[in-house]
Amino acid sequence: MTSKSSPLIFERSREGRYAYSLPKSDIKTNSVESLLDDKFIRKNKAEFPEVAELDLVRHYTELSNKNFGVDNGFYPLGSCTMKYNPKINEKVARIPGFSESHPLQDEDQVQGSLEIIYSLQEELKEITGMDEVTLQPAAGAHGEWTALMIFKAYHENNGEGHRDEVIVPDSAHGTNPASASFAGFKSVTVKSNERGEVDIDDLKRVVNENTAAIMLTNPNTLGIFEKNIMEIREIVHNAGGLLYYDGANLNAIMDKVRPGDMGFDAVHLNLHKTFTGPHGGGGPGSGPVGVVKELASYLPKPMVIKDGDKFKYDNDIKNSIGRVKPFYGNFGIYLRAYTYIRTMGATGLKEVSEAAVLNANYIKARLSKHFEIPYKQYCKHEFVLSGVRQKEFGVRTLDMAKRLLDFGVHPPTIYFPLNVEEGMMIEPTETESKETLDYFIDTLISIAEEAKNDPDKVLEAPHTTVIDRLDEATAARKPILKFENLKQEK
């Protein structure tokens, strides 16, 4: 690995330097020892970096210039919906009445915030076809886990606590089996058929009296719509199981079809994906969960309800699984999502899905002569191609992804889902222009040509980034996670 990276903030530290100072307080202070038990007090001084304010500003400005995001360039990361985040969302989120409020304020003082929460719940109920929605979960996987805990409580309350199996397709997001495990279930895999859809015969084989639920994304992770969803619903419901909808791919079907109309009993959404909350830097996210009326009494508490002309928290939820997030989730993301929904309207959301599907199919059609396309039918918002042709020249999908960096494009998701050899999952979203799509397509075609005629150029990529190829094996086996470890290495 060759590095042209910046020094760490700790490496810029010089003893005695500081960014600013505070005037001496004229208020009597107490020692830490008088306030905390000895077991909570550090024995050694914390090694905070000591830098001047200018050095601090330059350090983080330099790092920010090396970041890549949707505002920098094309970001076709499959199943992540890296769409443009409208700046009006940020303006609304910074309105002082919202941004300066506190979650412990009296309900009477935050009626506007509670109205936003209530109104967003109502909008999401309409979009998903669910009867009730909680906004508490802080991310997609958190929403998955919350829904599964609701399922678990429901089965136990109905004398069927023996139901401990959750069916997960082989093309599912990795968080699905992980969430099932965290919720105390066993994962059972159902195979895909030759069209990339759930194999109905295999589903009939794995469903049994212990089936608690099936977790599905529709369209699925291959970008293919599960056209047999009503038959899947019948099979699982007849066995006493429930249907869970992973909302990761909702961007493909808004105002076209609703999870509730497909027979799902619970759904999670990603406000940070479909509804333009900024993401890609680790958060904050938001993963609301919607349920049918039979499961409403199990939702996390409190819920925000409307009582006459006022909005308030409701803790009187009979079978509630309890609180799943401090206060009431990530409110700033609610503001952005609500702004987006109200700005777009139902017609706008429908056009979003139509454009997302059109863009994905356009890229797929143009690349089909240059890459292997495992599933030939029309896709929805994303699709998976395979790099098996390029592998014949010693170039793998990973190498092509690295080469894309040299052209200012963030690589698509690679080697996922696991059932496609040398897979590359591409999701362009609706917000990209035809010019951007053509640039990406032409770039991938040129990389495919390089793989054939000049493979070393691809194998040695990237050539223009701050950091060249990482030694991924060493990074995985001997990670340096603390500055203290870095000092020891040196």
UniProtKB/Swiss-Prot annotation:
<dbReference type="InterPro" id="IPR049316">
    <property type="entry name" value="GDC-P_C"/>
</dbReference>
<dbReference type="Pfam" id="PF21478">
    <property type="entry name" value="GcvP2_C"/>
</dbReference>
<dbReference type="InterPro" id="IPR023012">
    <property type="entry name" value="GcvPB"/>
</dbReference>
<dbReference type="GO" id="GO:0005829">
    <property type="term" value="C:cytosol"/>
</dbReference>
<keyword id="KW-0560">Oxidoreductase</keyword>
<dbReference type="GO" id="GO:0030170">
    <property type="term" value="F:pyridoxal phosphate binding"/>
</dbReference>
<dbReference type="InterPro" id="IPR015424">
    <property type="entry name" value="PyrdxlP-dep_Trfase"/>
</dbReference>
<protein>
    <recommendedName>
        <fullName>Probable glycine dehydrogenase (decarboxylating) subunit 2</fullName>
        <ecNumber>1.4.4.2</ecNumber>
    </recommendedName>
</protein>
<comment type="similarity">
    <text>Belongs to the GcvP family. C-terminal subunit subfamily.</text>
</comment>
<comment type="function">
    <text>The glycine cleavage system catalyzes the degradation of glycine. The P protein binds the alpha-amino group of glycine through its pyridoxal phosphate cofactor; CO(2) is released and the remaining methylamine moiety is then transferred to the lipoamide cofactor of the H protein.</text>
</comment>
<dbReference type="InterPro" id="IPR015421">
    <property type="entry name" value="PyrdxlP-dep_Trfase_major"/>
</dbReference>
<dbReference type="InterPro" id="IPR020581">
    <property type="entry name" value="GDC_P"/>
</dbReference>
<keyword id="KW-0663">Pyridoxal phosphate</keyword>
<dbReference type="Pfam" id="PF00266">
    <property type="entry name" value="Aminotran_5"/>
</dbReference>
<dbReference type="GO" id="GO:0004375">
    <property type="term" value="F:glycine dehydrogenase (decarboxylating) activity"/>
</dbReference>
<dbReference type="GO" id="GO:0005960">
    <property type="term" value="C:glycine cleavage complex"/>
</dbReference>
<comment type="subunit">
    <text>The glycine cleavage system is composed of four proteins: P, T, L and H. In this organism, the P 'protein' is a heterodimer of two subunits.</text>
</comment>
<feature type="modified residue" description="N6-(pyridoxal phosphate)lysine">
    <location>
        <position position="273"/>
    </location>
</feature>
<dbReference type="GO" id="GO:0019464">
    <property type="term" value="P:glycine decarboxylation via glycine cleavage system"/>
</dbReference>
<dbReference type="InterPro" id="IPR015422">
    <property type="entry name" value="PyrdxlP-dep_Trfase_small"/>
</dbReference>
<dbReference type="GO" id="GO:0016594">
    <property type="term" value="F:glycine binding"/>
</dbReference>
<dbReference type="InterPro" id="IPR000192">
    <property type="entry name" value="Aminotrans_V_dom"/>
</dbReference>
